[in-house]
Regions:
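Histidine-centered active-site/metal-ligand motif
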Residues: 1, 58, 86, 272-275
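Loop/helix-junction capping segments adjacent to catalytic residues or to phosphate/diphosphate-binding pockets
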Residues: 2, 36, 186
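Active-site catalytic microenvironments for nucleophilic, acid-base chemistry
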Residues: 11-15, 107
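Metal-dependent amide/peptide-bond hydrolase catalytic core
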Residues: 102-280
Length: 280
C-alpha cells in the first residue's frame, strides 16, 4: 500500500530529474487508513491545498481505474447513565443504563425499515454493566451511520440522536452523545479516470506466476471460496457509479482537490476482505 505509493512517487521524481516530465511530486504519508478519519484532519489543516491533483490507489482483487463513489458516514458514541441497585432485592430503585441502550438499538433497528436501501446502520456495544445481579448504571455504544451523500447522513444522525433521547426518557436515565468524526463521499473525477485508464492500458494486464495463482487458490480453499485464483486483467473504463459498500477519508480530499483513483490486484479473487486471507 504505502510502499507502492512511495515507489510511484520516486519513479515520477526520477523522470522529473531526467527532464522527461515537468512538475512537482509530493508523497504524503496518510496514517490510520482503516480508522477512516486521518485525512479529515489533514484536509482541515490545509495539507492538500497546494495540489493541482491528488492520486490515490487501493489494493484489491481487480485492476481498474476508479469511477465509483464511496459512502459518507458519521461516527459517534452514546453513553447512558442510570442508578445502581440490587437486581433482585430492590430493582425498583434502579435505573438501568443497559435498558436504555437496548431501547436505543431497538429504535435504530425499527428505523432501518424507513431508510434508503443505500444507507447503513452499524453499532458496537462498548460498555454494558459488570455483574448480572446489579442494575447497571452505565452503558456506552459506538454507532456508525452511512449513506451515499453527507446530506443524507446528517438526516440519519438527527434521527439517531432523537432515538437516544427517547431511550433515556423511557428508562428514567440520562444520556450523552459524543461526535467522533464524519467523512464525505468521493467526488468522482471522470476526466482523471479516463487519463488513468489510458495509462493503465499502456501498461496492460498484470501477470501472475503459476506459484502465485496456486498460493491464491490455497487461500481461497481454506476460506471456503471457489478457487478462481488471481484476476490481473485490466477492466474497461466503467461508467460513473454510486457507492455500494465502503467509506474512505479520501472523500474529504476529493472535496478540496481533484482526485484520480485506481485499484490493482494484490489478493485472491473474491476472497474475504478485512481478514487474514487478504493479509496472506
Amino acid at each position: 500500500y504505502g510502499t507502492a505509493s512511495l515507489g510511484a512517487a520516486v519513479a515520477i521524481k526520477e523522470q522529473i530529474e531526467k527532464g522527461n516530465l515537468k512538475g512537482t511530486v509530493i508523497f504524503y504519508g496518510t496514517p490510520a487508513e482503516e480508522t477512516i478519519f486521518a485525512k479529515v484532519w489533514m484536509v482541515r489543516e490545509g495539507v492538500f491545498d497546494k495540489l493541482d491533483v491528488c492520486m490515490d490507489w487501493h489494493p484489491g482483487d481487480t485492476t481498474e481505474s476508479g469511477t465509483q463513489s464511496s459512502k459518507a458516514l458519521v461516527d459517534f458514541r452514546v453513553s447512558f447513565n442510570g442508578s445502581s441497585s440490587h437486581a433482585s432485592s430492590d430493582p425498583w430503585n434502579g435505573r438501568s443504563a443497559v435498558d436504555a441502550m437496548e431501547l436505543y438499538t431497538t429504535g435504530l433497528n425499527y428505523y432501518r425499515e424507513h431508510i434508503l436501501p443505500t444507507s447503513r446502520i452499524h453499532y458496537q456495544f462498548e460498555a454494558a454493566g459488570d455483574v448480572v445481579n446489579v442494575v447497571p448504571d452505565y452503558a456506552k455504544i459506538w454507532t456508525r451511520l452511512r449513506g451515499n451523500s453527507v446530506e443524507h447522513v446528517n438526516d440519519l444522525y438527527d434521527r439517531a440522536l432523537d432515538i437516544a433521547k427517547a431511550a433515556a426518557m423511557m428508562t428514567g436515565t440520562t444520556y450523552e452523545t459524543k461526535l467522533i468524526s464524519g467523512i464525505y463521499e468521493i467526488l468522482v473525477n471522470r476526466t482523471g479516470a479516463a487519463i488513468m485508464q489510458d495509462n493503465m492500458e499502456t501498461l496492460g494486464d498484470i501477470s501472475f506466476s503459476n506459484d502465485e495463482v496456486s498460493y491464491a487458490n490455497t487461500i481461497l480453499k481454506e476460506s471456503g471460496k471457489p478457487q478462481i485464483g488471481l484476476d490481473g486483467k485490466l477492466k474497461p473504463l466503467m461508467p460513473t457509479l454510486p457507492a455500494t459498500g465502503g467509506s474512505t477519508d479520501v472523500g474529504d480530499v476529493s472535496q478540496v482537490v481533484p482526485v484520480i483513483r485506481m485499484s490493482a490486484t494484490v489478493a485472491a479473487k473474491n476472497g474475504p476482505w478485512h481478514s487474514w486471507a487478504v493479509v496472506a
